[in-house]
C-alpha cells in the first residue's frame, strides 16, 4: 500500500511535528507533503521524500508560511496524490482539503480544527498586531468555509484528545477516534538529572532546590496564560521558574521587576528541562490546550500538575492522584488551587507515592502506545 503523509508546515520541531515524526516512523516508505519544509529545523524525516506546495516558493514562504494560510486551501487541492492508496494528514486546518478519489483512504489526525477562526478567534484576535487583526477580519469567513469544505475529503478523523473530538463534532459534525499524542516518557522518567540549570545563552546558572519552586514550561503566548502563573506566584510570594520564550517575555519580566522569586530561563536543553520538572514542587498549567504534552512530561518526571480543568489536560491528569484542577479561569482561581495544593495534607506530601502515581499515568502516553492505537484507527473500519 503506497502511503502519503501530510502536515501543514514543517518549519519547527513542536508538538505537532513530533507527532508527525512518529507517523514517519510508522510509515518509513511514505512520501511527505507539506506547504513548507526546513530540513535543518525538523528531525526524523531524512529518509522520506518531501514535496512542498507552491507556498514554499512564495516570498518568505518557508520562513513564515502562516502568512499564506489563506492560500493554503488552493495549494492543498493542487497536491498530486493520485498514486497513493492511503493518505494520512496531521492537521490543524490548512492541508486536509486535498483532491482524492473515492477509492483512496484519507485518515486525518486532527490536532484541532482551526482554533483561530472558530472558538478561539477572540483570544487570537486580542493578541494579534494591527496587521494580524485586519487579516483575521478579512479572511475569517473564507477560512471557515474552506475548513468545513476540507473535512469532506476525510474518511476517518482521529482526534488528539476528547476535547478536540468534541470540537470536531461541533464544527464538522463528524465522529472521531481518540489517540493521544506520543510523549517521550522514558526520557523524562529517567531519574538521573542534574540540580542546576543553565540559560540557553549559557550566561547564568540557577540552582534548583528540590520542592522549593513551581514551574511553568511552554511558549510565552497569550492563550497559554503564563501571565496567570507569574501573577499568582507574585501575589502569594511563591518561587516560580519560567521556561520558554515568546512575545510576552519582555512584558512578563517587566511585570515582576526585581522580584527574586520569579526566574525566567528562556529556552533550555532537554536535560535541563528534565531537571526542572523533576525538582519542581508542581507544574502550573493555566492555559487551555488541545492536548498538552507538557503536563505528561512533568508527570513522567514524577511531578504533579496544578491545572485549569479544561481542555486536553482532562485526559492526561488524574485529579487527586497526579494533580488537581481548578475551575475559575482567573488568577484568583489559580491562587486558590496553589493554596489547596499546599494545604492538601499528606496526599501531596508523600513525594514517593505521588511520583510513582505520576510516572505510572505518564506511561499511558508513550510512543509505542500511540503507534499501536494509530494502526488500529488507520485500518479500514477503524
Description of each model-found segment:
Residues 129-157, 165:
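Membrane-proximal helix-turn-helix segments that form the acceptor-binding/catalytic region
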Residues 26-94:
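Active-site donor-binding segments of glycosyltransferases and PAPS-dependent sulfotransferases
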Residues 329, 349-379:
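A charged, aromatic-enriched C-terminal amphipathic alpha-helix characteristic of glycosyltransferases
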Residues 250-272:
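Nucleotide-activated donor-binding/catalytic signature segment of Leloir-type glycosyltransferases, i.e.
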Residues 275-280, 374:
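Short alpha-helical donor nucleotide-sugar binding micro-motif in glycosyltransferases
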Amino acid at each position: 500500500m503506497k502511503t502519503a503523509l501530510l502536515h501543514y508546515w514543517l518549519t519547527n520541531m513542536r508538538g505537532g511535528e513530533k507527532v508527525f515524526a512518529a507517523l514517519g516512523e510508522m510509515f518509513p516508505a511514505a512520501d511527505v507533503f507539506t506547504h513548507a519544509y526546513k530540513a535543518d529545523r525538523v528531525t526524523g524525516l531524512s529518509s522520506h521524500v518531501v514535496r512542498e506546495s507552491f507556498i514554499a516558493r512564495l516570498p518568505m514562504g518557508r520562513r513564515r508560511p502562516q502568512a499564506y494560510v489563506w492560500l493554503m486551501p488552493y495549494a492543498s487541492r493542487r497536491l498530486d496524490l493520485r498514486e497513493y492508496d492511503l493518505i494520512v494528514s496531521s492537521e490543524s486546518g490548512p492541508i486536509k482539503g486535498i483532491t482524492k478519489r473515492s477509492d483512496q483512504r484519507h485518515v486525518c489526525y486532527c490536532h484541532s480544527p482551526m482554533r483561530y477562526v472558530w472558538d478561539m478567534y477572540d483570544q487570537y484576535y486580542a493578541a494579534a498586531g494591527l496587521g494580524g487583526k485586519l487579516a483575521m477580519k478579512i479572511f475569517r469567513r473564507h477560512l471557515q468555509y474552506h475548513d468545513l469544505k476540507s473535512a469532506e475529503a476525510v474518511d476517518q478523523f482521529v482526534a488528539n484528545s476528547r476535547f478536540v473530538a468534541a470540537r470536531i463534532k461541533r464544527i464538522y459534525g463528524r465522529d472521531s477516534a481518540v489517540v493521544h499524542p506520543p510523549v517521550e516518557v522514558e526520557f523524562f522518567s529517567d531519574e538521573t538529572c542534574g540540580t542546576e540549570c543553565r540559560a540557553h545563552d549559557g550566561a547564568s546558572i540557577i540552582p534548583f532546590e528540590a520542592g522549593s519552586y513551581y514551574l511553568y514550561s511552554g511558549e510565552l503566548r497569550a492563550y497559554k496564560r503564563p501571565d496567570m502563573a507569574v501573577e499568582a506566584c507574585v501575589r502569594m510570594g511563591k518561587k516560580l521558574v519560567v521556561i520558554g520564550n515568546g512575545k510576552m517575555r519582555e512584558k512578563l519580566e517587566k511585570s515582576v521587576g526585581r522580584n527574586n522569586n520569579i526566574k525566567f530561563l528562556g529556552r533550555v536543553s532537554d536535560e535541563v528541562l528534565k531537571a526542572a520538572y523533576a525538582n519542581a514542587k508542581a507544574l502550573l498549567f493555566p492555559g487551555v490546550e488541545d492536548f498538552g504534552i507538557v503536563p505528561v512530561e512533568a508527570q513522567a518526571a514524577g511531578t504533579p500538575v496544578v491545572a485549569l480543568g479544561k481542555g486536553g489536560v482532562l485526559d492526561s491528569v488524574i485529579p487527586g492522584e497526579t494533580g488537581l484542577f481548578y475551575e475559575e479561569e482567573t488568577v484568583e482561581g489559580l491562587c486558590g488551587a496553589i493554596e489547596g495544593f499546599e494545604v492538601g495534607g499528606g496526599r501531596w506530601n508523600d513525594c514517593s507515592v505521588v511520583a510513582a502515581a505520576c510516572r505510572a499515568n505518564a506511561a499511558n502516553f508513550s510512543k509505542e502506545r500511540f503507534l499501536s492505537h494509530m494502526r488500529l484507527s488507520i485500518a479500514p473500519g477503524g
